UniProtKB/Swiss-Prot annotation:
The keyword Flavoprotein does not apply. One of its GO terms (biological process) is lipid A biosynthetic process. Acetyl-CoA binds at N385, Y386, A422, R439. Homotrimer. This is Bifunctional protein GlmU. Gene3D superfamilies: Hexapeptide repeat proteins, Spore Coat Polysaccharide Biosynthesis Protein SpsA, Chain A. In the N-terminal section; belongs to the N-acetylglucosamine-1-phosphate uridyltransferase family. It comes from Lactobacillus gasseri (strain ATCC 33323 / DSM 20243 / BCRC 14619 / CIP 102991 / JCM 1131 / KCTC 3163 / NCIMB 11718 / NCTC 13722 / AM63). The active site is at H362 (proton acceptor). Binds 1 Mg(2+) ion per subunit. It catalyses: alpha-D-glucosamine 1-phosphate + acetyl-CoA = N-acetyl-alpha-D-glucosamine 1-phosphate + CoA + H(+); N-acetyl-alpha-D-glucosamine 1-phosphate + UTP + H(+) = UDP-N-acetyl-alpha-D-glucosamine + diphosphate. Keywords: Acyltransferase, Cell shape, Cell wall biogenesis/degradation, Cytoplasm, Magnesium, Metal-binding, Multifunctional enzyme, Nucleotidyltransferase, Peptidoglycan synthesis, Repeat, Transferase.
Length: 461
């Protein structure tokens, strides 16, 4: 049987009070509509169609290559939105699942179970339902004695007996595709909103003698729709718990999982420990047996095995096996730390490679440089790479020693086994085995204390 998924993503989302199109707000690193598309992909459908309206180009950019698109010119209700996909679907055999782009918590497992229930039951329409702890505000599912769905009753229209029902409509449906589009053409807009409701299709199908059923999913929280910032925060919290629990099942330890903020695409190896107040975002990959301490932030970075990150920030950076950094250091884009290297506290590295077993201990800036292996960079060293117009590169060879307080003014090449004396300002190349000293000689003034006007001040004696 052919399977199709239609995702409704044309609403304005005015309650978000945002310039950003509603379904493009992110939950754990992905836009809401991407989460829904990913769940849809998990059903292996023959076609995914996203119905767009407001912000159509932005949604198309995000979902390029993942979905076909239909355009809803005016937002005239959910029924009208699905009908916008008729040119792509109307005459096809199979089953169509309809979901909304502002429900990021649905899983592929739930969508697969809905397809399965729909097919096995021989329904023309199957409603995805859930038992709500507090069903107020939701449409209630009213069934007959055989469990078939008679109707969906909205809060404002229900009798006391109907409103006592705790099974609610999640807004996701599965239909026989051809019957869906036949019924949609019969849906009217004689209601207070003047809109065409997808739920009216159920009554049309039932009156035509078609079977309408339901699949009750076990986890009500999946059905959370995001219409404002409060719901966005709730969805993020639920998604974050789901992500962290999955990592824990795979052997990752969280000291405080409630304060570890991990995006959905992050990969973490087993035996890694993550403390509280840690943020890991984007396409970051972290190896096994690492330790990430509190207040660390890692974005789009690749971390090897046996790495320790102490209260530091990494962005588009790479740390190979058996390296460490921090506290309070910053790896900026294109920083590469090779195996066994040590980056200490208050170090900033940008677009630079630190070779194997090299040490950059503290209070140092390294930018636009390539450092070899077994190098020691002294405290307070600055790689001066910018002349106000262009950036320039510095090379430091293997087994070199850079003394404390040095300033390396690019472009220069410091050869293998060479030395730079403390507090030197280096503007020329340094040859192999040489030591560069570029500072004024020390001069001592004998008995200078007694020549100062303040020398007789008792506080100075």
């Amino acid at each position: 049987m052919n399977k199709y998924v239609v995702i409704l993503a044309a609403g304005k989302g005015t309650r978000m009070k945002s310039q950003l199109y509603k379904v493009l707000h992110k939950v754990c690193g992905k836009t809401m509509v991407e989460h829904v598309v990913n769940a849809a992909k998990g059903t292996n459908p023959d076609k995914i169609i996203t119905v767009v309206g407001n912000g159509a180009d932005s949604v198309k950019d995000v979902l390029a290559g993942q979905s076909d698109f239909a355009f809803q010119e005016q937002q005239l209700g959910t029924g009208d939105a699905v009908l916008a996909a008729s040119d792509l679907l109307e005459n096809l055999d199979g089953s169509t699942l309809v979901a909304t782009g502002d429900t990021p918590l649905f899983t592929a497992e739930t969508f697969n179970n809905l397809f399965k229930k729909h097919e096995e039951s021989g329904n023309s329409a199957t409603v995805l339902t859930a038992k709500a702890p507090n069903p107020f505000g939701y449409g209630r599912i009213i069934r007959d004695e055989d469990g078939n769905v008679l109707r969906i009753v909205e809060q404002k229209d229900g009798t006391p007996e109907e409103l006592a029902v705790d099974e609610i409509n999640t807004g996701v449906f599965c239909f026989d595709n051809k019957e869906l589009f036949k019924a949609l053409k019969q849906v009217g807009n004689d209601n207070a909103q003047g809109e065409y409701y997808l739920t009216d299709v159920l009554e049309i199908m039932r009156k035509a003698g078609h079977k309408v059923g339901a699949y009750e999913m076990p986890d009500f929280s999946e059905s959370l729709g995001v219409n404002d910032r409060i719901a966005l925060a709730q969805a993020t919290k639920i998604m974050q718990r789901r992500i962290n629990e999955e990592h824990m099942k795979n052997g990752v330890s969280f000291i405080d999982p409630d304060t570890a903020y991990i995006d959905s695409d992050v990969k973490i190896g087993n035996d890694t420990v993550i403390e509280g107040n840690v943020v890991i975002k984007g396409n970051t990959e972290i190896g096994s047996d690492c330790y990430i301490t509190n207040s660390s932030r890692i974005v789009d970075s690749k971390i090897g095995n046996h790495v320790t990150i102490t209260s530091s920030t990494l962005q588009e950076a790479q740390m190979d096996d058996n390296t460490d950094i921090g506290p309070n250091s910053h790896l900026r884009p294109k920083a590469v730390i090779r195996k066994g290297a040590h980056i200490g506290n208050f170090v900033e590295i940008k677009k630079a490679e630190i070779g194997e077993n090299s040490k950059v201990g503290h209070l140092t800036y390294v930018g636009d440089a390539t450092l070899g292996k077994d190098i020691n960079i002294g405290c307070g060293t600055i790689f001066s790479n910018y002349d106000g117009v262009k950036k320039f590169h510095t090379n430091v060879g293997d087994h070199s020693f850079i003394g404390a307080g040095a300033t390396i003014i690019a472009p220069v090449n410091i050869a293998d086994h060479s030395f730079v004396a403390a507090d030197s300002t280096i503007t020329k190349d340094v040859a192999r085995y040489d030591m560069a000293i570029a500072r004024g000689r020390q001069t001592n003034k004998p008995d200078y204390w007694h020549k100062l006007p303040l020398s007789k001040d008792k506080e100075w004696e």
